[in-house]
């Protein structure tokens, strides 16, 4: 009986397992997940879950009963420590599992502030998993002062929730504009206006110099323009990096993530990767995407290829973000355009077309 082991517990991991079963795979499937929860949705963490509008059970991608019904073994609260490619085994907490095919769906981790500028102070939060958000949620009480470092999706979504909860929000973005890495100027302008009308103070072209604290807890911040502000807590949203350590330790090829070919195979043909953690061929170069649709699409392709399909992956980049009562949807990449067309059918809908 063929054995598939999946390292990781997010959207890609769940999608590989589900697609294998739906395609008729009758071998064993095991998912090794470092969290104590089955695979769950991450996007709502900084939106509806943080607002208290979504319960934990609704976060789960599939109920626990699904894994039992589909004969998928979950190893929760476990982390893969080592891959033995010669023996085709993964080792974790004194156990080992043999595999015929191993899928690395390791995801990514948030970048943290260096300790020397206050990154280790208490009440300095990231927003990546349930543990992060469960620790952060009690801070969201009216009139508290929060500094948000980073003007990407996570920072802006957290700012929206904080403003809706009546907090005093300052957001700093070291680039010239918010959303600079992921969206064009017109989109940045729209969301800057949206946030400022909700009372968020946005400082662009300004970075954090250092956080200050008292008795180990953050109490203030010094910005690069010399501004000093008093705060009750801080949220760091300065990007993520792919988890590649166990792949690197196993001698697999690493670039901006775990390197895979068009089929999703790593430099070891019996080891595959999908989602945030891997970089794949794209138009003569290499690309790594951080989005739920990509994680699902690539994971399902990997599952089909494990079963012999030999399909090549070509992404359909699609991203979304919910802020206040506005939904941002982006299709395509923020590169290689010369012209922008603005279209608006009513006061609540606007679109920007880049070509």
Residue locations for each model-derived region?
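Rossmann-like NAD(P)H-binding beta-loop-alpha module
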Residues: 135-183, 218
């Amino acid at each position: 009986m063929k054995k598939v082991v999946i390292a990781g517990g997010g959207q890609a991991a769940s999608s590989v397992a589900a697609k294998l079963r739906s395609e008729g795979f009758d071998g064993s499937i095991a998912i090794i997940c470092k969290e104590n929860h089955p695979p769950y949705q991450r996007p709502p963490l900084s939106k509806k879950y943080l607002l208290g509008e979504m319960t934990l059970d609704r976060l789960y991608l599939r109920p626990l009963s699904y894994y039992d019904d589909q004969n998928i073994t979950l190893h929760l609260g476990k982390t893969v420590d080592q891959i033995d490619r010669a023996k085709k085994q993964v080792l974790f907490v004194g156990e080992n599992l043999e595999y015929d095919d191993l899928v690395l769906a390791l995801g990514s981790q948030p970048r943290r502030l260096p300790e020397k500028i206050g990154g280790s102070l208490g009440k300095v939060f990231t927003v990546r998993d349930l543990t992060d958000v469960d620790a952060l949620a009690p801070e969201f009480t009216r009139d508290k002062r929060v500094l948000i470092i980073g003007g990407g999706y996570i920072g802006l979504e957290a700012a929206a929730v904080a403003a809706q909860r009546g907090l005093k929000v300052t957001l700093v973005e070291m680039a010239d504009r918010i959303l600079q890495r992921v969206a064009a100027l017109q989109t940045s302008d729209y969301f800057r206006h949206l946030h400022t009308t909700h009372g968020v103070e946005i400082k662009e072209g300004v970075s954090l110099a250092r956080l200050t604290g008292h008795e180990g807890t953050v109490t203030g911040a010094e910005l690069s323009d010399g501004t000093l502000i008093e705060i009750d807590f801080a949220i760091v949203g300065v990007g993520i990096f792919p988890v590649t350590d166990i792949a690197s330790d196993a001698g697999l090829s690493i670039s901006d993530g775990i390197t895979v070919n068009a089929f999703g195979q790593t430099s070891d043909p019996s080891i595959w990767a999908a989602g945030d953690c891997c970089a794949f061929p794209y138009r003569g170069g290499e690309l790594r995407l951080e989005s739920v649709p990509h994680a699902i699409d690539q994971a399902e392709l990997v599952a089909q290829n494990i079963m012999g399909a030999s399909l090549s992956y070509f992404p359909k980049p699609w991203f979304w973000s919910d802020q206040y009562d506005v939904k941002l949807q982006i299709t395509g990449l923020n590169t290689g355009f010369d012209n922008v067309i603005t279209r608006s059918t009513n006061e609540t809908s606007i679109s920007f077309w880049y070509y």
